[in-house]
Amino acid sequence: MEDKQETCPKGDSDFVSDKVNFKTEEDDDQTPCHSLEQVDFKSESEDMRQTDSGDEQADIRAASCACQPSGKFLAAESEDDYGSLFSQYSSTLYSVAMEAVTQSLLSSRHISSRKKSPAWKHFFISPRDSTKAICTYCMKEFSRGKNEKDLSTSCLMRHVRRAHPTKLIQENGSLSAGSSFSPPSLLLPPQPADVGDLSTVLSPVRLVQKMAPKIPSPDQIMEESVTVVSSEELSSDVSVTEKYSREEALAGSSPNLSMLHYDDASETMADRNLSLPKSTSGSRRRSAVWKHFYLSPLDSSKAVCVHCMNEFSRGKNGKDLGTSCLIRHMWRAHRSIVLQENGGNTGIPPLYPMPPTLLPALLPPEGDLNSASLSPGKQVKESPSASSSPERLPEDLSSHTNPGDVSREDVSMLSSSDDLGEASVVSSPEKQPADTVNPRFESGTVFQQNKKVMRRLKSEVWHHFSLAPMDSLKAVCRYCSCVISRGKKGDVGTSCLMRHLYRRHPEVVGNQKDFLGASLANSPYATLASAESSSKLTDLPAVVRKNHQGVFPTNSKKTSKLWNHFSICSADSTKVVCLHCGRTISRGKKPTNLGTSCLLRHLQRFHGHVLKNDVSEATLSRSPGIRRPLGIELSGPSSFRDSTEKFYDSHPVAKKITSLIAEMIALDLQPYSLVDNVGFNRLLEYLKPQYSLPSPSYFSRTAIPGMYDNVKQIIMSHLKEAESGVVHFTSGIWMSSQTREYLTLTAHWVTFASAVRPHCEDHHCSALLDVSQIDCDYSGNSIQKQLECWWEAWVTSIGLQIGITVTDNPSIGKMLSEGEHSSVQCFSHTVNLIVSEAIKSQRMVQNLLSIARKLCERVHRSPRAREKLAELQKEYELPQHQLIQDVPSKWSTSFHMLERLIEQKRAVNEVSIECNFRELISCDQWEVMQSVCHVLRPFDAASREMSAHMSTLSQVIPMIHILSRKVEMLFGETMGIDTMLKSLKEAMASRLSATLHDPRYIFATLLDPRYKASLFTEEEAEQYRQDLIRELEILNSTSEDTATSNGCDSGSPLKDTGTEESLWSLAPIKRDQREKLPEDMVLAYLEEEVLEHSCDPLTYWNLKRSSWPGLSTLAVRFLGCPPSTVPSEKLFSTPMDAGSFGQPRLMMEHFEKLIFLKVNLPLICFQY
């Protein structure tokens, strides 16, 4: 085979051709009508080949130049056909490679030093890099060495021995059978009887590569292709009979050249093409899955699904490609297609005898069929392998069908098929019947064929759904009219639709035949099917038929019986809520990897009796002779999803729904008669038909009182965790819209390590303890008795101490001071009094507020003014805000009203003029308004700062200093409001001077690491430091007395329980009797740097508990008290303004419990 090579110029056309020998044999064992004609191509291209005999050269010239049929050589028309065939490759992914291969072979004919090895019969030099070679069988590139001076063919031969061993066997056989002058031809093995045999075939790429040396140049190929195609276009008006006669004559001129016959589904006629001989080299694209995929025209390592047109990778590199991803995609996304094609047969369909072609068929643009004459894609007429469907066309589609006879119904397909018009599609060439005649068909017919096959492969789920008219990515259920998304653009499927059927309409699924039968056992999807079925057996009862053993494939994640006891948390999908105790349990950290192990452990630990009931029911369901409805089997033995049986009262789902309804009554302060409302009952009947709603008396006598007792016990357990054993309070008198007055008491404490709230970074805790109605003519004694009663029930009875009580009512504060209870005034209430006095002190400011108030009221009442204001806001690009109407008794609302008017100044002026308002704001008034806002802004910020949840008493003194300095600065920054500023200064001095010298505020400020002694003078700092040391000594003495009373005497000797004399008593023990003195702790604390204002002081003292335990306890006593009652007032502001506490709606004896639940349920995170 390495002998000689012949260079044979071709007359005038300069066509260089090697010897091409075609030897065809027919398989006599096959039926004459279905005989498979086979062709063997053998080509040899050696650089230094000696000249053959003159007769042989003459024959080659006659075959290549004169184009006359001669024996075993190719005819001219056949050569033109091959030119047209090869022209298809020039515009595809492989066209560049093929042209480069041709040029490389033609240009390197006279180079004899590098291609003497037998490896060059299977490789050619890469046109991009001369140190690399490309395999002619698999088109993979291999390196021959690092530099051009040291090149070898060891890697090349190794690749041939490993990847293509049969090529070497064929080569050796041909050497023994023939001579060097007469190239031998390989005899094709007989066609096996089993069509599904996995015998290997010769790839079309090899065909192209073996014939590449016969290609003169890409330009000549294109010219010949144009000639052939143009002649076909011009003769389009010729009758079909004449076309057949011409083809038969051409076939008769070269009887030894056999052709493949393919089934034409659109015209039931055949097209001729060259047959590819079988090989034993082992093609990688022979799997049955290639009926549903074709190779991507842009990347040969990827495949495109013909159903959803999605692209999938077959491997990371070109050396390790497979079909596992393709099989997995078909099983997950198009399972119904797989089951449909395997459901009626005893095995998988026969595999392809040939791999799919690597090149796509290029469809011409619509309406311009002639434009394809210059495109290699026109070759689509020659081979049905260019069809967009990889599956063998069914016999029922082989009737005479013309492109114009395609019905409009064929166009309305799955929405995924709408994207096929733009895609270049390739099928897997399958063996077709050989007794049919194959005329050339138009590209439009191919596209219509594709649509017909696509519709036949349409998923069965579309019998139950229809595409949404407004959005093609969604489908509408035919039973419940629900709109379900099919995925994102470019990645649509039917998984969500199947899941909807299994969850909402299992009875429809039950009426269908088994989707997974025994016929799927031998298919590529058997592994996936068996794995999925085995994973479902533990959670889903098997639905077994007489003749089929399998389960319904379901994608639902809630098939486990555990979901009868849990529901997915609405706030976080990775967590679930137990229907028995209401606890939140995590299912995993990653949303893509969630499980039910934690759910099972929770039931085993806290609700073991529930699992026992499930086991007994499961045993009953598995008893012979008992058949359960399909819906109950699919959703678990304890599920009542599709059953008409009502829940019993102790059922976990019924108990959870009843508890949620009771929560709704408490949180929204709804009357108990809500459960009798028709609309509410209809809603529950639709959401959960198996649930029976209890009567109103059940909620008023059982549900709400029981919930109140549970929440009260939880609040008590929280109070026991208070640090330093001190609880602070806020108390006040709250008036409802019914002119009823209520006394409230709210507790505030600090918790560092809570067993109820683990991993909680917020150390500030609060809870509403009680609410009680009082008479309008209440006295201080009655309030004191009520508070003493509450403190005894909530605080002193569990060993806690009563701390500081913050109130905005002067009478309550006076009463507490007389009763030896520590109390302070609400800072926010004091600021309100100061600002209100300052506003009333200057008449001009009052007149300005009156004008602004009337102007805003007119705009709110006039639709014309509102529309004009909106137009001017758009014209002047102002914020689209409405004007604010203030409440005269609340200065903060007046401040926000003035700020909004200044923001909309330009629009407000024009609206006032165009709408003829009597209230017009002058330029001087606008300036005064800005000055008033400038003064009120720091006081508004101070009120909001001190009303925050984490604010403490330590912030009061720093805030007073800040406001005093700001007022001094405002005298030079404002105009026209000096009287107001003087009133502010005097009111602050009279109302806040006592606070600056209050030891409780001073200690709180010193113990706050953000301030310490930075706000005091040196004399004051030294005095307050000594006071703090004495306070700490008093606290230590109290704690030592408590420790001695508990029996923890440090001086008592240690005694061994085992013997009277302990050996350890002989060891010398040295104890450090020197403990940290209060003075040392205080000095060490004050010497540290001051922290930033954003830091939490309680977090700081939590870290210092081990270093300074006594000082940390003292700090918690003062820093745990809030400076304002506003946080407590916010809990009652909404119902008071809504005016929903009418006597007909709520019974007064129940109102106290409802308001208690309304406030505390969110505070304990509904864990009761």
Curated annotation (Swiss-Prot):
Q: Which parts of this chain are annotated as the region Required for homodimerization and nuclear accumulation?
A: 1083-1168
Q: What is this protein called?
A: Zinc finger BED domain-containing protein 4
Q: Where does Zn(2+) 3 bind?
A: 477, 480, 500, 505
Quick one: which residues bind Zn(2+) 4?
578, 581, 602, 607
Note whether DNA-binding occurs among the keywords.
Answer: yes
Crosslink site: Glycyl lysine isopeptide (Lys-Gly) (interchain with G-Cter in SUMO2) = 42, 489
Q: Give residues where Phosphoserine occurs.
A: 623
Which ranges of the sequence are coiled-coil? none
